[in-house]
Amino acid sequence: MKIGLFFGSFNPIHVGHLIIGNTMAETTDLDEVWYVVSPQNPFKKNQSLLHEFDRFDMVTAAIANNPKFRASDIEFSLPKPSYTVDTLTYISDKYPQHSFVLIIGEDNLDQFTNWKNHEQILHHYSLYVYPRPDSSNSFLREHKNVRLVAAPLLEISATYIRNLVKQEKSIRYLVSKEVEELILSRKYYSNY
């Protein structure tokens, strides 16, 4: 199978993440999209994160009804911070029967040369890139392993959602009903 790996903090997972995943699953040659919950992004060292298992629970709840989606906690057992190249190597060794593609936003493509061993990633893996606001035209757009995928341009921010929760305002329609129920019942982000 050809699997798209969609890495993220998912703090929380929101409808923007789901729309991007669905677009990738339905409009490209991917068989599945795996939402890889990252315990710690090396570029966001000081970010206040909900515990990784709580974020994994939200991802699992959000994608439960889509057979083309899968939640992955594979980075939980790897050294932190999580570097994409290390996870890709590990996951490719663990699942040699699959081929993997990296799903990233255009804003990440702009910063891709700052990633650990980015040349190795580009040499061995394809990047499926979705549009993001305020992205520049990275020279990597022309790379043979970079595929630009037409997807809705969404400006939904997890920070915005967390702030709404803290202010006791509705997050309806920004997250799935299942995620909203988890956030409210477990009081996630109330003291953010």
Curated annotation (Swiss-Prot):
Q: Name one GO biological process term.
A: NAD biosynthetic process
Keywords of the record: ATP-binding, NAD, Nucleotide-binding, Nucleotidyltransferase, Pyridine nucleotide biosynthesis, Transferase
Q: Which Pfam families match?
A: CTP_transf_like
Give the EC number(s) under which this enzyme is classified.
2.7.7.18
**Sorted alphabetically, which InterPro entries does this protein's record hold?**
Cyt_trans-like, NadD/NMNAT, Rossmann-like_a/b/a_fold
Q: What class of enzyme is it?
A: transferase
Pathway in which this enzyme or protein is active? Cofactor biosynthesis; NAD(+) biosynthesis; deamido-NAD(+) from nicotinate D-ribonucleotide: step 1/1
GO-annotated molecular function: ATP binding; nicotinate-nucleotide adenylyltransferase activity
Q: According to its UniProt record, which reaction does this protein catalyse?
A: nicotinate beta-D-ribonucleotide + ATP + H(+) = deamido-NAD(+) + diphosphate
Q: Which NCBIfam families match?
A: cyt_tran_rel, nicotinate (nicotinamide) nucleotide adenylyltransferase, PRK00071.1-3
Q: What does this protein do?
A: Catalyzes the reversible adenylation of nicotinate mononucleotide (NaMN) to nicotinic acid adenine dinucleotide (NaAD).
Family in the record: Belongs to the NadD family.
Which protein are we looking at? Probable nicotinate-nucleotide adenylyltransferase
